[in-house]
Structures are given as C-alpha cells and as structure tokens.
Amino acid sequence: MSEVLGIIGEYNPFHNGHLYHIAKSKEESGAEFVICIISGNFVQRGDTSIVNKWAKAKMALANGADLVIELPTVYSISSAENFAQGAIKILNSLKIVDTISFGMETDDVAILNNIANVLYNEPKEYTTMLAHELKKGNSFPKARENALMMYLNDIKKYVNVLSGSNNILGIEYLKALKKTKSHMIPMGVKRQKVLYNDEYMVDEFASATSIRRMLKTREFDDIRRAMPKSSYQILGQELKQGHYVIDLSCFEKEIIYTLRKMSQEEIANLPDVSEGLDTSLKNAANSCNTLKELINIVKSKRFTQTRIQRILLYALLGIDKKQMDISKKINPYIRVLGFNAKGKQLISEMLRINPKLPVITSVKKYMDSLPNKNLKEMLNRDIFAGNVYTLGYEMDSWANLDYTNKIITM
C-alpha cells in the first residue's frame, strides 16, 4: 500500500489551520492516504466540542481525510500524556500508518524530541528537580516546565517551546512513540500566523479558541473567513438545527447536582483528584450556584482550571480511577466515524493484516457480540458521553445517537 499518514486532532471546529496542516503534511510526507484520529463530543482541555463528532468527521472528510476514527472519551478528556498515548496506540494497532504529523509552534522537531527523551527516560537529576518544584506548590505542568528548563540548562532555547499547547502535545506524541516502540515516523508542521490560544485573526487564520469565542458573539463573517467553505456550511447546518454545545457551562446544573450526589469518597476516586481536592470540590458544589463560581473557588496555583474542568467531566460522565488505569494498559478499539472510497481501502487493508482488529462500524453489532469486557465498558462511556452531550442541544436532545447515526460516507 502507498504511504499512509496519521493525524491526531480535535477539530473544534475544523478551520483553515487544520486544512493547511493536512495539505502540508501530505505534501511533505508524500502520503496518498490520510487517517485522522479525532476527539468526540468532549475535548482534552475539559470542555465540550462545539459540534458533535459526526459533524467533525464530515468536516475532516471534506478537507483531506480519508478515514476518521474516534478517540475514546476516556482518552480524549484526559491529560496530554494520556490523550497522546491513546491516539498513538490506535494508530500503532492499524499497522498501516507510516508517518504521524502534528502541529507545533516551533519549527524544529528535534527540540521537542530532546524534551521527549528526558520525559521518557526520567533521569534521576530531572526527577529530583521535579519533586522539588512540586513541593513549592506548583501545578504539575508548571513544575515539569521548571524542572525541564533547569535540567536542559538552556533557557534561551527552550523557554518558548514549553509554553506552546501544540508543542506540549507534540512532545507527548513523541514520548508515546518511544514508549510503544512505534515504527511510525514523526513529523511536525509549524502553526501558521496564530497560536492555539490567540483570540484574533491574521488574514484567513484564526485559532479554534478564537472561533469558539466568535460563535458566542455571533461574528459569522469572521468565522466564515477562518474556515473552509465546506466546514462553515456544516457548522451552519448544526447551528440552524440547534445541534451545538457552546461550552461546559451548558451542563453546570448537571455537574453541580452530580457532585452534590456523590460521596466525598466517590469524588476522591475520580482521576486527577488528590491532596484534599475532594473536600474542596464537595464544599464548593454544596455552596455554589454556577460552574464559574465553583471553578474559581477550587482552582489554585497547584490545581489549574483545565485540571478542575477535566475532573468535573470525569464526574459528569462517570469515569473513575480504575477505568482510567485500565485504559492505560489496553489497546483501544477502532471506532469508525466516517470514510471515503480511499478510506474503505484502508479498512480492508487493516483487516487483511489483522482480521481480529476490533474495528467498530456498528455499535449494536459490537455490543451484542459480547467483546472484551474492558473495551465494552470503554465504549459504554462513549455512548453515555453522547447521551449527556445532546442534553446541551437547543433542540432534539435525543439519546443513543451512537446506535442510530450512520457512518459518514463521502
């Protein structure tokens, strides 16, 4: 088979930067086929996806992807490390992907690889520095950044690298490739003109963060400029039908209710909860009226807002530490969201190489076949996440769309 490219993204929503990334990656790798792994209805920074996973799959297929696979929820709302490992495990399991491409703020993959080597090998000097930084009360990301800067001993070279959201994910992809002894070749594509959190446009480029802000203020002319025509049309259809969820605040009553209902022991059993955070969350839930108020009370130098939001999603979606631990030990299933003619070829080739590969094209058939217990529970979390997600719609808050929605074909 010709060269196959793997890309991991959230596409929340799919914009011109994503289009550039796919086109540039194909050009530089010489790939004929593109497989995209995308997060589903909830995303890595502990928030909702603006539109559902099928709409995002349509956007990707209309703009260069041949096969779109869902990253299971347990990975997609987790830390950068778990997010990357889940996606890399999926791509590895396909046994047909030659190159993995990711966006980055720097223009030098070697710099990211230097950092990934330290994180993978964990030399004693580095871990001692990390422990020291954590004792100062820093959040884990900040403590890790400080420890890496000291260990690598080249502030000028690395200071801006560790502040880039795409760089951080890129480092985790590289680390996951090493951890899984992957044969896939990594390549990076530098972001164009705007960074991940920039809230302004430059020419036809805007970050997904900026587009989501513009959606709240209904700046549709700028949104149209920042997205491929097909993506904008798909977004418009979803908005017109009331099938969108602006952000996590759409579920604030459900989240506060869930935390009030949970015992403190159950809260303590949520991933990322440690060091008395269970007490803070329980007390805040019992006294707060809004999600914003709850987050502002609980977040601190030690516990970032993103970490708090992830924990709130774990509570809302019923994901505990045991499920998270299992996800780190097993290979996920291959949940197909959509494909075109070339994508159909890819699926055939995957199954030719490994007929037992857990490829899901029908959720009902897969659940009825009594598969691996751990994979079944993981898929149940995806289904439940979808059932919760539609509660945020303005209209048609139907459950079980994972059973009724068809695979997107183009």
Where are these regions (language model features)?
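N-terminal catalytic cores of NTP/NDP-binding nucleotidyl/phosphoryl-transfer enzymes
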Residues: 1-56
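Class I S-adenosyl-L-methionine
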Residues: 23-26, 57-61, 175, 212
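Non-catalytic positions within long, well-ordered alpha-helices that form the structural scaffold/packing
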Residues: 26-27, 61, 88, 92-93
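Short, high-confidence coil segments that cap the C-terminus of an alpha-helix
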Residues: 29-31, 65, 96-97
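Active-site cores that bind ATP or allylic diphosphates and position pyrophosphate for catalysis
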Residues: 71-410
